[in-house]
């Protein structure tokens, strides 16, 4: 058995699930998601929990077992609680603001960078240097957060740019001349 795949998924109250040939649908207070899965696997509800089962121990089924269980668990968590990824801006004059639903970043370019959120994702700016990306689809929220970070990745020498909150950036030392002549002669 897959260590991940055999774990049951708790279904919170207010969340309804429906499984039809290869499609898992879940509806909750935050919205509705559809997760396609391999029709060889079965998803059944048992005492308020979901169980993902595989028909055999073939390599293909073992590989899909844990993946499907995780995708279903993410969908259930998304429609009940949602997902939030926090980003922060580091750098002199770097700031963010909301322009309607769009995110406007001033991050060292000659023009502000405007990012429109796709359907199902919202931006929040609690402080000028903090950005919250939220939504019900974990994959989409993560991809949008990565796209925002990609606009200005943290540089290797000063760490200026857009980073995930708590992300450690390994800074390079810089030129030996900048350290007071302690390099090779």
Swiss-Prot record:
Gene3D superfamilies: Ribosomal protein L6, alpha-beta domain
GO cellular component, one term: cytosolic large ribosomal subunit
The keyword Manganese is assigned to this record: no
UniProt keywords, alphabetically: Ribonucleoprotein, Ribosomal protein, RNA-binding, rRNA-binding
Gene Ontology biological process: cytoplasmic translation
Pfam family, one: Ribosomal_L6
GO molecular function, one term: rRNA binding
Superkingdom in the source lineage: Bacteria
KW Cell wall biogenesis/degradation (keyword) present: no
Protein family per UniProt: Belongs to the universal ribosomal protein uL6 family.
Subunit structure and binding partners: Part of the 50S ribosomal subunit.
Free-text function comment from the UniProt entry: This protein binds to the 23S rRNA, and is important in its secondary structure. It is located near the subunit interface in the base of the L7/L12 stalk, and near the tRNA binding site of the peptidyltransferase center.
Name the record gives this protein: Large ribosomal subunit protein uL6
Native source organism of the sequence: Deinococcus deserti (strain DSM 17065 / CIP 109153 / LMG 22923 / VCD115)
């Amino acid at each position: 058995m897959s260590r991940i795949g055999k774990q049951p998924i708790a279904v919170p109250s207010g969340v309804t699930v429906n499984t039809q040939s290869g499609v898992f649908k879940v509806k909750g207070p935050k919205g509705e998601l559809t997760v396609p899965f391999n029709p060889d696997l079965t998803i059944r509800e048992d005492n308020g929990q979901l169980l993902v089962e595989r028909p055999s121990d073939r390599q293909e089924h073992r590989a899909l077992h844990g993946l499907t269980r995780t995708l279903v668990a993410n969908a259930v968590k998304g429609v009940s609680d949602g997902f939030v990824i926090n980003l922060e801006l580091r750098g002199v004059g770097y700031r963010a603001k909301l322009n309607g639903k769009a995110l406007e970043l001033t991050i060292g370019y000659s023009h502000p960078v405007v990012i429109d959120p796709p359907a199902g994702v919202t931006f929040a700016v609690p402080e000028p240097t903090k950005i919250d990306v939220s939504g019900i689809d974990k994959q989409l929220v993560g991809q949008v957060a990565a796209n925002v970070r990609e606009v200005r990745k943290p540089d290797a020498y000063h760490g200026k740019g857009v980073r995930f909150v708590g992300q450690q950036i390994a800074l390079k030392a810089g030129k030996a001349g900048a350290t007071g002549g302690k390099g090779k002669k």
